[in-house]
């Protein structure tokens, strides 16, 4: 079974030769290619290079476009702090939903609008 067959069979509940190996490798992939994490999470080409390299080198069954836990929140208007060599993080003292009623006023972000989610879609396209 190749990786694609393994993952699709597993998702469909069919037997597989072994469980798909699908670890979350964001920081590891970035370190493997010697990139700065800020570049990994903001430049889709760096993310793709890291994901392809780590999957090929270690025999993982997939690649992903995850970069940090703040990508979508950022596009919704959350205040996010970026770091040179670790994942971005939301600034908790300025939490977008510190007041839960703010949820009713949030606008849906446009994933193609040039924000951080757009970077993820560019990675998928590569």
Stretches with model-predicted labels:
Residues 1-126:
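Catalytic cores of TIM-barrel enzymes
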